[in-house]
Amino acid sequence: MIEVNNLVKEFDGFRALDGTDMHVKKGAIYGLVGPNGAGKSTLIRHLTGIYRQNEGTVKIAGEDVYENPHIKEKFAFIPDDIFYFMQADVMEMKRFYQGMYPKFDDKMFYRLMEYFPTINPKKSIRSLSKGMQKQVAFWLAICTRPEILILDEPVDGLDLVMRRQIWSIVMADVAERDTTVLVSSHNLRELEDVCDHV
């Protein structure tokens, strides 16, 4: 499903990734763990087509990722630094996601609403706490029904109850649809609890 071979990325002469290889099978929950600055986010930005590699290949389902909108429809990405349109509320972002992702599941959106009872869907997302903004990002992403879910520090800043709830939803999606999940974190203990491979 995900194949990275001999990936090299340089920034102004600094080699952030040096011959990185990674192979993730369909339906796996794969964890990337390491301290800040280890290259986890750089690798993820290649997998999502944000960065173009200096050398090597980055493929999803056998296709190059960079500048490939067909492949990008197949995955949802929750970055560590979430961005929302100014003054957009959850319902407006839902409509935006529906326009971007043909498989967006409206019924699932309303079903998952009960898992996020503290979030007012008509309130500006930017006025919510960072933890609530992460919950909104996850809520919207999972409703796109992605084949691949790419998560960068997804539960950082969430309380224990919400962390468990998020992982429960992810596990149910993997079991139901054989979703492939790639998650990066500095928390090895948490990844060991949820991942097939770390």
Where are these regions (language model features)?
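ABC transporter nucleotide-binding domains
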Residues: 2, 9-195
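H-loop (His-switch) and adjacent beta-strand-loop-beta switch element
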Residues: 198
